[in-house]
């Protein structure tokens, strides 16, 4: 509806573009210019692709706006120009990448003096980055021609946007070969050496930080690329250059030259920490990141890096003792003089990374310098510095979990470990770790007893104590730790054992989260039986709680089904009794023992299931009760052999006349069929009882009770067919409906002898008598053999035997002559009726027994009609 009436607001840009004197600024003043550009507005893109427009857009980006402009709109046009050029329109990217004059104009921004405008630098970096991503070959070729490009990048590295541009140049090129060419080109330009030179105390802090971050990102990107492309034949040239020993020595020489500059030291340590990221398992809880199929050479630390760092361990140790001067810091806890500082914190991080490599030579140097003792003193001195406490805890855990000797880095020096963990002995004996823990714990308890505050490192101290206990029980150094504890003085050992069983145990018990016995959450009032209280003690409850957690029933016991016990909702047992909309989907399992009766009934059911075309009755109920008429094939079929089952009308349904047209004489114990028409929508048939085909039954059993499923009383066994009582039940308005798959007249209802139907069904008295005698004489044979159903009729002066067969095309059961030569038409039957009108009149005058149909019970005359038995097969 919104688009139908054209209620959407049209863009004003199209109106502006129709003017010949429209300017670029007028278009940029429109609010929806960016949306129209990204929506590929053809007129707008054609306008922007003009040479003067592209040149103006680039000029807005690289030129400083006037100082006298309002600050709110000063950078409006540069911002919109950047967004238009980076809207990723292929036509604009192609024009910028192919026009060298525009590229040169854009490149001229780097020629400005430092520092660059950070906002304009971000616009420039964004435009050039998308050009590198979309047109890598053209842009890289253009930059290679500019011999001062790397110099300008180094010159403006203090601007974060320029640092981002350098990283974009390394990451935006996806094809392997062009990327390798860029790496080789940058390595030839000595980008690594130039960045390392920037990390110098004489440089500014921003340049320190950006140069360090650039080198760290180069290391990470190169290693990630090596993990992704394992089959790469060429190593990353930038990473190989940075890992050289002389480059690391140059970096360390810069930061320790003359004065101590915290910014330069921290930036250099950040580079070293990135190079020491081994990504290998260290102590319990750490997971190996190196892929299984990847050799550890790609994940391990380069030997040259460790050798270069080892030569400067003394300088780093001096930083722990005498850091760069810092002013006194006042905190809520007290006065820090001097504070820990970023320098010493990063030095401790570097020591923890070196301990992770587990290099025997570096471990020996750390023991000689007593660096572990220094950082342990800092742990207890600075009570509230959790960054420091975390790093000290990691160092102690690494020492406790490190194996005896380093097998991978054993070739670094000639001195290998002797199989004895000297650093672990140093931690227990010289650093006196156990004594320091006990003293700090007792001091904290004494302070808390006096009403003081708990020390801030107590949580980390608890974890360190638990790590020692864990290393005593299991781990690569369990035997050595047990021996070191035994070698303690008796007093200290007893205090330690008492501490582990009392203070440490109680603390662990308080810190343990109770998973079972607290705060049961019940979903309803009926859940008490599902959540019963545990009967075991709390001390040994963890394993039992986990076992019960695995075995418990996670959901409540719900009833299987939800429903309503109301009459308007069907029960489960009544589903089979509802009316079906698709009758053709119903399948019956029929008993195949009585082939003759089954064939007859199948024919009736198949005829019933067909949708009758009654020429106007579209809403006829196909399950409405109708009368059944059985006539021989000679009276039903024409000489052509076609059936007329679909030529009926709906007059019978309109006047509501329902009358049964056949009457079984007697009940035969062998041949009986019982059908109940009392409930047409859900009628059922009983095939276990033989079909009734004999005479003698009263007429009131025919009608609504014909389909009854009740067991009839057995009667005298006689012949199943008697044609001496032929009458017609067809009227003029029912003549077209008298054709069913099998018709057999058994009713004695009176009829009009002058109607065409009566003439068609009347037979000569002699023929009728002969048929009756023949049927009576053959009654016993029919009772004995029910597999073959036959009929004997008099056709003219000849006797003819008809057998019940099923037509393969129409699937209807019909009586056919055994010789297959003679076929009696309705015209011949009409001729016989004209020759013997007395017989017809005599039959019409025969008394009619009371009927059970509604019309006969009310005393009103009912129109004769037939009932076609429809039912699914």
Curated annotation (Swiss-Prot):
Biased composition (Polar residues): 724-749, 853-873
Residue list for modification Phosphoserine: 315, 579, 617, 634, 722, 853
Tree of life domain: Eukaryota
Keyword list, A-Z: Cytoplasm, Nucleus, Phosphoprotein
Modified residues (Phosphothreonine): 631
Pfam families on file: SAPS
Chain intervals with Acidic residues compositional bias: 644-655
Protein's GO biological process: regulation of signal transduction
Major site of localization recorded for this protein: cytoplasm
Subcellular location: Cytoplasm; Nucleus
Annotated region described as Disordered, given as residue ranges: 628-873
The protein's name in its UniProt record: Serine/threonine-protein phosphatase 6 regulatory subunit 3
Any one Gene Ontology cellular component term annotated for this protein: nucleus
């Amino acid at each position: 509806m919104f688009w139908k009436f054209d209620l959407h607001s049209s863009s004003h840009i199209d109106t502006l573009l129709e003017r010949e004197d429209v300017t670029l600024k007028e278009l940029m003043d429109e609010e929806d210019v960016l949306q129209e550009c990204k929506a590929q507005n053809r007129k707008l893109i054609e306008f922007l692709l003009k040479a003067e427009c592209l040149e103006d857009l680039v000029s807005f980006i690289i030129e400083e706006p006037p100082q006298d402009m309002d600050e709110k709109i000063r950078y409006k046009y540069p911002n919109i120009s950047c967004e238009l050029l980076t809207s990723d329109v292929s036509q604009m990217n192609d024009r910028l990448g192919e026009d060298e004059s525009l590229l040169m104009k854009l490149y001229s921004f780097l020629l400005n003096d430092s520092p660059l405008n950070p906002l304009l630098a971000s616009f420039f970096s964004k435009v050039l980055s998308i050009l590198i991503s979309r047109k890598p070959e053209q842009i890289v070729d253009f930059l290679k021609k500019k011999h001062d490009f790397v110099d300008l990048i180094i010159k403006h590295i203090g601007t974060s946007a320029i640092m981002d541009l350098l990283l974009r140049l390394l990451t935006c090129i996806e094809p392997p070969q062009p990327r390798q060419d860029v790496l080789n080109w940058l390595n030839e330009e000595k980008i690594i050496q130039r960045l390392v030179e920037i990390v110098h105390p004489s440089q500014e802090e921003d340049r320190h930080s950006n140069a360090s971050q650039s080198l760290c990102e180069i290391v990470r990107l190169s290693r990630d690329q090596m993990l992704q492309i394992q089959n790469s034949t060429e190593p990353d040239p930038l990473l190989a250059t940075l890992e050289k020993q002389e480059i690391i020595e140059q970096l360390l020489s810069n930061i320790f030259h003359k004065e101590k500059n915290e910014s330069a030291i921290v930036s250099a340590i950040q580079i070293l920490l990135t190079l020491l990221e081994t990504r290998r398992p260290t102590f319990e809880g750490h997971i190996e990141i190196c892929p299984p199929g990847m050799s550890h050479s790609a994940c391990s630390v380069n030997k040259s890096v460790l050798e270069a760092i080892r030569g400067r361990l003394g300088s780093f140790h001096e930083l722990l003792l005498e850091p760069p001067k810092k002013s006194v810091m006042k905190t809520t806890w007290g006065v820090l003089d001097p504070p820990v500082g970023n320098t010493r914190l990063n030095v401790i991080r570097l020591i923890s990374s070196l301990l992770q490599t587990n290099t025997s030579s570096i471990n020996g140097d750390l023991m000689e310098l007593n660096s572990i003792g220094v950082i342990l003193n800092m742990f207890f001195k600075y009570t509230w510095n959790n960054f420091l406490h975390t790093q000290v805890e990691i160092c102690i855990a690494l020492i406790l979990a490190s194996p005896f000797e380093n097998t991978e880095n054993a070739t670094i020096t000639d001195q290998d470990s002797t199989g004895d963990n000297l650093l672990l002995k140093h931690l227990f004996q010289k650093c006196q770790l156990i004594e320091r823990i006990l003293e700090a714990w007792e001091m904290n308890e004494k302070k808390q007893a006096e009403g003081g505050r708990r020390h801030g490192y107590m949580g980390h101290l608890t974890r360190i104590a638990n790590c020692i206990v864990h290393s005593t029980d299991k781990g690569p150094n369990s035997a050595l730790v047990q021996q070191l504890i035994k070698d303690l003085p008796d007093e200290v050992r007893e205090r330690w054992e008492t501490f582990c069983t009392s203070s440490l145990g109680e603390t662990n018990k308080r810190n343990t989260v109770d998973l079972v016995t607290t705060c049961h959450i019940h979903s309803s009032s009926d859940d008490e039986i599902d959540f019963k209280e545990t009967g075991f003690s709390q001390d040994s409850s963890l394993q039992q709680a986990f076992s019960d957690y695995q075995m418990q029933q996670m959901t409540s016991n719900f009833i299987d089904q939800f429903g309503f016990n109301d009459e308007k909702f069907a029960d489960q047992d009544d589903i089979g009794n509802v009316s079906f909309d698709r009758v053709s989907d119903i399948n019956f399992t029929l008993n195949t023992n009585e082939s003759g009766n089954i064939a007859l009934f199948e024919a009736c059911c198949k005829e019933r299931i067909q949708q009758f075309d009654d020429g106007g009755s579209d809403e006829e109920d196909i399950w409405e009760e109708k009368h059944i008429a059985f006539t021989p094939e000679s009276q039903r079929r024409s000489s052509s052999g076609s059936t007329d089952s679909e030529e009926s009308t709906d007059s019978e349904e309109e006047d509501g006349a329902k009358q049964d047209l056949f009457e079984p004489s007697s009940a035969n114990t062998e041949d009986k069929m019982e059908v109940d028409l009392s409930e047409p929508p859900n009628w059922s048939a009983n095939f276990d009882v033989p079909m009734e085909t004999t005479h003698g039954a009263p007429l009131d059993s025919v009608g609504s009770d014909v389909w009854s499923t009740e067991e009839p009383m057995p009667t005298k066994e006689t012949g199943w067919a008697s044609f001496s009582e032929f009458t017609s039940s067809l009227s003029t308005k029912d003549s077209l409906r008298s054709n069913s798959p099998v018709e057999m007249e058994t009713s004695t209802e009176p009829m009009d002898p002058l109607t065409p139907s009566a003439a068609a069904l009347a037979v000569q008295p002699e023929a009728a008598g002969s048929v009756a005698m023949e049927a009576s004489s053959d009654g016993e044979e029919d009772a004995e053999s029910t597999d073959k159903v036959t009929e004997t009729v008099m056709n003219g002066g000849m006797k003819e035997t008809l057998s019940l067969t099923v037509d393969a095309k129409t699937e209807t059961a019909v009586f056919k002559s055994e010789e297959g030569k003679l076929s009696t038409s309705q015209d011949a039957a009409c001729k016989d009726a004209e020759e013997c009108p007395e017989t017809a009149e005599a039959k019409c005058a025969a008394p009619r027994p009371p009927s059970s149909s509604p019309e006969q019970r009310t005393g009103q005359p009912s129109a004769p009609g037939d009932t076609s038995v429809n039912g699914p097969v």
